[in-house]
Structure formats: structure tokens, C-alpha cells
């Protein structure tokens, strides 16, 4: 009988630590709903004590999601654990994930505590978490550089205190597969009460080995893996959920376990996370990249046409890919629109949101003859993004360009419900547009990244623009879509500005 491998998704917590990837409460709820549809076992919704916004997001996800365990991170401090417990009150099933550093350098330089003091604090934290839930996870931060004898000592103590999951993090992505797998195996074998807890892996991708290290951990006894959609996360990111899940499922000849993940929702989850965070999926990204199932070489194409398994080890349709099938047109009705979006995993909270999305669909259908699923997802994502309260709204944009002449952009914005207009003349249409917006917003913004991609194929395709803005040390991403690239650019810039005005810095720890 195949053992169950628990999938612990931390896109909403660790994934959010990607530079500029801060999410609003509504964005976290949207991603959490998709994770629930995917049948993710545990959703780490945030770090409840980090900010009021984080607390509200954890609380909202806990109240809405019914079929996944909802988790909040908490340092091994009473105030953190109490805040997490309060945020999780409404959850159908909850978990508190507490942690403390265990490597010599962290204990000495960061915590300024002795090993015995660290053990005592960890035990007290687990016992306090038990006031709120009997589902308690403990992580020895920087376990990859910790002394193994000390790891055995502290893990045995926290299991005895009530920890039910032991998560071994490679916080700085330092380990390599055989080393990390051996650590997991040794801990399970050496700790007397290891059978009372599930062992978990949390790997970072600094050396490009997060998925490989996690798979090695599974082969050596770990039965939970912590991961993020698209491998999002601080620095080089975390273990990629889609890669880990499909590796285990594809190689059942090697792994004696499998996940409960409904892989049909992998692609939609990937695109949603990309849209919300502004982190574009590279074309050659395994499983979800545009080229993941493409075959250029003639010999490969011939082989696939004759028999798929000659060059494909997975079916594209099993992770949500289709053939860019034309699904709707300008004569399609509201109900057909709603039904198609439901099949794509998109739901609306009220008729007003549906009507707004349908209006935008009709506007798009007048500009673009062929409407694909990717168009619908991009359109709805923008609709839901703009449904949030915004201090700045784009009313109109007029751009005049001429070869070898400066470009002129006239922008009309609503700023705090006041209509304002500005014109700028510069060497480029995008630069002129951004300059005009900046003059109206009256804040100095540093543009760190500007990228354009097409949502589908064709000259009339929707263009998706992503910008990364920096303001007073804060980094945010903004997204915009339109059949006109300059308009999409303006939308993305305004979206980023609104995030600058609302997103606050949060003290997220590393694990």
C-alpha cells in the first residue's frame, strides 16, 4: 500500500518573501482557494504576528478554507503563539508552526542563548501551542548547519512535549541531496520517539537543489514536504510544489508514497501565483513553463506523433494544459462565461464581480477575435485585482509617437476621488507615460524592472506587463493586461503605486 506524502504549501508565507511579492488579504484568499481545490494538505497562511494585515489574512483564510489544515508560523515566544492561536480560531482544522534556531552560529550570535536555554524555550513553545491545537509543528531553524547530536536532543524533547510534525529546514540552501537525505534518515533512526511524529523537509534553492534535496528526504523517510507554487521564495526560492508532486507521481517505481494533489489544477495555480506576484514563469520551467511539453527537434516530433511515450514522461493534460482551445467569442452569454471560468477554477463572491468581469470580457471580445483560456484568466485576475480599494485609478491615456521625435503621453487619473491630468514629453512612450503618472502621484519611485509578455499568440494577443517598483526601501510588483502594451504598462504602474501606498514592511523570519 502506498504511503501518503503530505504537501505543506507555504506560498502565502515563505513565497511572499520573494522581493516585491507581498500579497493583499484578498490575493491570499484567492490563492488559498486554489490550493484547497488542489487538495493541498496544509496551507501556511502567514506569520500572524508580523503585522495586522498578516493576522487578518491568516484569520480570513482560516475562516474560508474548509478542507485543508490552516497553519500560522510563530517564533518560540508566547506572544507569537498566542497571536497565531487567535488568528486560527475559525479554522476547521488548524496547526501552529513554531521554530527556534539550533545552529551554533545562530544560537551564539543571533539568540545569544545556550543550547539548554534553546531547548527549554522550544519545549515551552510547543506546550503553549497545545493550548490552541494538538497539531503542532516544530522547526529547528538552520538545521542544515546544526550539530546532529544537538538536533536529536532538542527534537526528542519537543516530541515529548507534544510536537506532531518535525520539520528539518535547509535554511540557506547549503545541503546537497545525499547529505540532506542522510540527515533525515539518521534523525529518524537515532531519536527514540521519532515514530510519534511526521518528519518534514523544507529546502531552499540557493544551489538549485531544493527539489532534489526534498526528494532525497522523502526517500529517506520524510512524509511531509514544504513547498511553494512555482518555487517562489526569498533569494533563489523554495522547493517547487509542481516539480516535487510530479516527480513523486511519475516515478512510482522509486517512491513508495504519493500525494493527494489534484494535479489538474497545477497550471491554473501556477498562473494565478505568477499573476498575483508579478513573477513571470520562465518558458523552460518544468511542468508549467510554456515549453514544458513542446518538441522542436524533428525526430522528437515524429516520435511523439507516433507514440506519446517515446519522448514524454507525463501527459500535459494531467497538469491542466490544453491546446489553447477557443472557448468563447463576442456572442457568448453571461452563463457560458461563468461556466467556462468555473472549469478554470475561477469563482466569484457576488454577482457584481461576475458582471464586472463579463463586461471586461465583452470589451476584450470587441478588440480580439479569438478568446482563449489564458485570456480569461488574465482578464479575471486583473478584474479581481482592481476590485480592491485603490487610492489611484487610471481613467484614460493618450500617447502620441513619431519617428525621431519625442513621445507625448497625457494621463488622466483619479487620486483620492479627485480627477487630475498631466502630460509628459520624453524619448519613449512608456517613459512618457510613467513620467506623467509620477508627476500626478507626487512620490519618487525607482523602477527596478519592466517586462512585457504575450498571454497568448497572435498580434492581437493580450499583453501582460510586470513592473517592480522601489519606494523608501519597499519593493512591490505591479501587473497590467491589455491588447495595447502602453495601456497595459500604465495599468501595471498604477497597480504598483497602489501597492506602495498600502503594503507595509513585514518582519518575516527565515526558516
Swiss-Prot record:
Task: Identify the main location.
Answer: cytoplasm
**Residues annotated for Mn(2+) binding in this entry:** 14, 202, 204, 238
What this protein needs as a cofactor is: Mn(2+)
**GO terms, biological process:** L-leucine biosynthetic process
GO MF term set? 2-isopropylmalate synthase activity; acetyl-CoA C-acetyltransferase activity; manganese ion binding
Enumerate the residue ranges of region (Regulatory domain). 393-511
**EC number(s) of the enzyme?**
2.3.3.13
This enzyme catalyses: 3-methyl-2-oxobutanoate + acetyl-CoA + H2O = (2S)-2-isopropylmalate + CoA + H(+)
Stored InterPro entries: 2-IPM_HCS-like, 2-isopropylmalate_synth_dimer, AIPM/Hcit_synth_CS, Aldolase_TIM, LeuA/HCS_post-cat, LeuA_allosteric_dom_sf, LeuA_bact_synth, PYR_CT
Show where the Pyruvate carboxyltransferase domain sits.
5-267
Q: Entry's Pfam families?
A: HCS_D2 (PF22617), HMGL-like (PF00682), LeuA_dimer (PF08502)
Location comes to: Cytoplasm
Gene Ontology cellular-component terms listed: cytosol
Keyword Ligase assigned to the entry: answer is no
Could you name the domain of life of the organism this protein comes from?
Bacteria
Keyword terms of this UniProt record: Amino-acid biosynthesis, Branched-chain amino acid biosynthesis, Cytoplasm, Leucine biosynthesis, Manganese, Metal-binding, Transferase
The annotated pathway is: Amino-acid biosynthesis; L-leucine biosynthesis; L-leucine from 3-methyl-2-oxobutanoate: step 1/4
Cystine connections: none
Is Protease among the key words of this record? Answer: no
Q: What NCBIfam families does this protein's entry cite?
A: leuA_bact, PRK00915.1-3, PRK00915.1-4
Summary of subunit composition and partner proteins: Homodimer.
Job description of the protein: Catalyzes the condensation of the acetyl group of acetyl-CoA with 3-methyl-2-oxobutanoate (2-ketoisovalerate) to form 3-carboxy-3-hydroxy-4-methylpentanoate (2-isopropylmalate).
Q: Give the UniProt family note.
A: Belongs to the alpha-IPM synthase/homocitrate synthase family. LeuA type 1 subfamily.
What is the name of this protein?
Answer: 2-isopropylmalate synthase
Amino acid at each position: 500500500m502506498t504511503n501518503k506524502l503530505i504537501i505543506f504549501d507555504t506560498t502565502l508565507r515563505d513565497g511572499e518573501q520573494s522581493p516585491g511579492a507581498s500579497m493583499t488579504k484578498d490575493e491570499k484568499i484567492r490563492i488559498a482557494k486554489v490550493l484547497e481545490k488542489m487538495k493541498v494538505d496544509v496551507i501556511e497562511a502567514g506569520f500572524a504576528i508580523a503585522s495586522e494585515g498578516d493576522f487578518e489574512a491568516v484569520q480570513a483564510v482560516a475562516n474560508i478554507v474548509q478542507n485543508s489544515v490552516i497553519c500560522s508560523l510563530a517564533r518560540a515566544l508566547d506572544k507569537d503563539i498566542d497571536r497565531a492561536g487567535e488568528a486560527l480560531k475559525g479554522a476547521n482544522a488548524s496547526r501552529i508552526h513554531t521554530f527556534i534556531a539550533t545552529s551554533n552560529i545562530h544560537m551564539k550570535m543571533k539568540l545569544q542563548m545556550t543550547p539548554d536555554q534553546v531547548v527549554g524555550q522550544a519545549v515551552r513553545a510547543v506546550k503553549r501551542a497545545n493550548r490552541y491545537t494538538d497539531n503542532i509543528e516544530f522547526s529547528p531553524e538552520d538545521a542544515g548547519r546544526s550539530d546532529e547530536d544537538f538536533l536529536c536532543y532538542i527534537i526528542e524533547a519537543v516530541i515529548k512535549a507534544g510536537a506532531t510534525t518535525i520539520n528539518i529546514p535547509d535554511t540557506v540552501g547549503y545541503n546537497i541531496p545525499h547529505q540532506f537525505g542522510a540527515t533525515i534518515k539518521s534523525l529518524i533512526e537515532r531519536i527514540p520517539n521519532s515514530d510519534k511524529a511526521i518528519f518534514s523537509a523544507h529546502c531552499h534553492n540557493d544551489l538549485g537543489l531544493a527539489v532534489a534535496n526534498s526528494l532525497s528526504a522523502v526517500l529517506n523517510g520524510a512524509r511531509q514536504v514544504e513547498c511553494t507554487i512555482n518555487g517562489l521564495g526569498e533569494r533563489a526560492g523554495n522547493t517547487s510544489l509542481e516539480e516535487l508532486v510530479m516527480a513523486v507521481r511519475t516515478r512510482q517505481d522509486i517512491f513508495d508514497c504519493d500525494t493527494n494533489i489534484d494535479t489538474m489544477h497545477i497550471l491554473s495555480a501556477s498562473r494565478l501565483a505568477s499573476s498575483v506576484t508579478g513573477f513571470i514563469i520562465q518558458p523552460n520551467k518544468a511542468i508549467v513553463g510554456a515549453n514544458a511539453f513542446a518538441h522542436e527537434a524533428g525526430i522528437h516530433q515524429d516520435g511523439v506523433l507516433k507514440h506519446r511515450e517515446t519522448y514524454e514522461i507525463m501527459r500535459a493534460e494531467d497538469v491542466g494544459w490544453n491546446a489553447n482551445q477557443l472557448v468563447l467569442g463576442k456572442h457568448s452569454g453571461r452563463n457560458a462565461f461563468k461556466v467556462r471560468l468555473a472549469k478554470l477554477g475561477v469563482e466569484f463572491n457576488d454577482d457584481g464581480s461576475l458582471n464586472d468581469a463579463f463586461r471586461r470580457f465583452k470589451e476584450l471580445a470587441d478588440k480580439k477575435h479569438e478568446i482563449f483560456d489564458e485570456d480569461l484568466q488574465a482578464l479575471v485576475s486583473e478584474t479581481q485585482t482592481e476590485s480592491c480599494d485603490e487610492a489611484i485609478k487610471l481613467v484614460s491615456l493618450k500617447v502620441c509617437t513619431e519617428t525621431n521625435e519625442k513621445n507625448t503621453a497625457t494621463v488622466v487619473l483619479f487620486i483620492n476621488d479627485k480627477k487630475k491630468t498631466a502630460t509628459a514629453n520624453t524619448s519613449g512612450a512608456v517613459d512618457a507615460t510613467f513620467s506623467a503618472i509620477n508627476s500626478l502621484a507626487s512620490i519618487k519611485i525607482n523602477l527596478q524592472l519592466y517586462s512585457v509578455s504575450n498571454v497568448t499568440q497572435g498580434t492581437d494577443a493580450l499583453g501582460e506587463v510586470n513592473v517592480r517598483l522601489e519606494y523608501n526601501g519597499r519593493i512591490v510588483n505591479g501587473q497590467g493586461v491589455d491588447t495595447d502594451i502602453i495601456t497595459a504598462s500604465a495599468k501595471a504602474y498604477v497597480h504598483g503605486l497602489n501597492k506602495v501606498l498600502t503594503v507595509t514592511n513585514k518582519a518575516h523570519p527565515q526558516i
